[in-house]
Amino acid sequence: MNLGMMRRRYAKKSLPYDAEVEYLQSDGRQYIDCEVGIIYNADIVDIKTNVAFTKITSRQLNGTNGYFFWGISANRKFEFSGTEIPYNANFNVWNMHCEPYTKLKLYMNGVEYNSSSTPGDNQYSFAIYLFALGGRNNAAASFFTSQKQSNATITKNGVLVRDYIPVRVGQVGYLYDKVSARLFADKSGVGFILGPDK
């Protein structure tokens, strides 16, 4: 066995999961707390993710129903600063970019969508969730979605903070973050439906 093969085998064995899978699937109960905070009226955030909704109602990514609301709705609407913004394309690959919230600008797959809502002047913190919306000042998850989730990245103020791939340990699904080298589990305790191994 040559040195390159030995290194590849060691690297594979040292990973904290058994296999990469094509996707994790939720049924409207599960969610993942990405442990990435956003400061309202301050941060610039990009989220790139590949999602296939399995039901036509439910929202995902992150937000709250108070002063701040940012997410994607399966019924063809964006949620941004409390306002629903219709969109016309049936996206599966989501590329969201939100400028500091004082600018009230949301870009989706390169298209600008403006909200008519006016955000408050205060700076609140928000958590980014996948499969659900997070709330202001660490409020509980809400608006859970039914979807198939594959890779996802989160960039905050120009820095890559999460780079997720769906994996399994035994028959339990996780998102593995290549940035922090950590497994992120379903916070509900229900567990994800696993896609096939890659």
What annotation goes with each model-predicted range?
Residues 16-81, 156-162:
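Extracellular glycan-recognition modules
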Residues 116-148:
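Flexible glycan-contacting loops in extracellular carbohydrate-active proteins
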Residues 157, 163-190, 198:
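Extracellular glycan/ECM-engagement signal in secreted proteins
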Residues 88-111, 155-157:
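Localized edge beta-strand/strand-to-loop motifs within extracellular or lumenal beta-rich domains
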Residues 1-21, 180-198:
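Enriched but not universal
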Residues 74-96:
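Short, aromatic/His-centered strand-loop micro-motif at the edge of beta-sheets
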Residues 83-86, 111-116, 159-163:
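Surface-exposed loop/edge segments in extracytoplasmic proteins
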Residues 150-154:
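Extracellular beta-strand elements of beta-rich domains used
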